[in-house]
């Protein structure tokens, strides 16, 4: 398959170096974008390939066979950034973000993990407060796949509390945040 050939030819020769140096494989990601790997399950009307989930899974599997890092870059971009926008975003958000993400012009990431909570969504400390017609997020995330390399982030934050099964629980929401948003900064590795 195209995925296997690409993985063997373009990804495998660099896999050990990528893992040892922890340098983001930008050139490889750009090549994957050229081949349409970053938008495989995205409908064609949003700039993707319009393929089924099995085709996408085959791509990630072939990449993972030779380089787990590269497979995770693709899956975080596609499954954790594009998919929430496609599933829960407004039409305006889909039109604004998905075509550039699906074509690989922009890279996506997902921010859930926090220093004191790990991936426990109910342990989240990052808060979002509505200020006029804008949400203001305040908190810290860590271990974000595609981190500093990404352009568009899905960030998880607490927006309030709700009653669930007789007890109060945190209401968790997802926000689309663009790199360059005032106050959105990166710590050191």
Protein language model features and the residues they cover:
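Short, intrinsically disordered, charge-balanced linker/junction segments flanking boundaries
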Residues: 1, 187-189
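Amphipathic, small/basic residue-rich leader segments at the start of a protein or domain
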Residues: 1-76, 92-103, 107, 130
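Conserved protein kinase catalytic domain
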Residues: 60, 82-85, 98, 154, ...
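N-terminal glycine-rich flavin-associated loop
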Residues: 72-92, 118-121
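A short, Trp-centered hydrophobic/proline-enriched beta-strand micro-motif
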Residues: 104-112, 156
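Short, solvent-exposed loop/turn elements at beta->coil junctions and helix N-caps
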Residues: 112-117, 142-143, 189
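Cytochrome P450 C-terminal beta-domain/meander region
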Residues: 120-138
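A short core secondary-structure module
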Residues: 134, 138-187
């Amino acid at each position: 398959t195209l995925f296997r050939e690409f993985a063997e030819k373009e990804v495998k020769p660099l896999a050990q170096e990528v893992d040892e140096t922890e340098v983001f494989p930008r050139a490889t990601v750009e090549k994957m974008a050229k081949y349409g790997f970053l938008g495989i399950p995205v409908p064609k009307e949003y700039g993707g390939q319009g393929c089924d989930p099995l085709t996408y899974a085959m791509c990630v599997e072939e990449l993972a066979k030779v380089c787990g890092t590269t497979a995770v870059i693709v899956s975080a971009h596609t499954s954790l950034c594009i998919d929430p926008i496609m599933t829960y975003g407004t039409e305006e958000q889909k039109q604004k973000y998905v075509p550039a993400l699906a074509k690989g012009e922009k890279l996506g990431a997902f921010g859930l993990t926090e220093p004191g909570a790990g991936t426990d969504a109910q342990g989240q400390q990052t808060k979002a407060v509505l200020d006029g017609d804008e949400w203001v997020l305040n908190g810290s995330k860590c271990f974000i796949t595609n981190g500093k390399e990404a352009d568009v982030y899905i960030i998880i934050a607490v927006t309030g509390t709700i009653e669930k099964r007789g007890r109060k629980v945190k209401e968790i929401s997802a926000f689309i945040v663009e790199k360059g948003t005032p106050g959105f900064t990166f710590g050191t590795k």
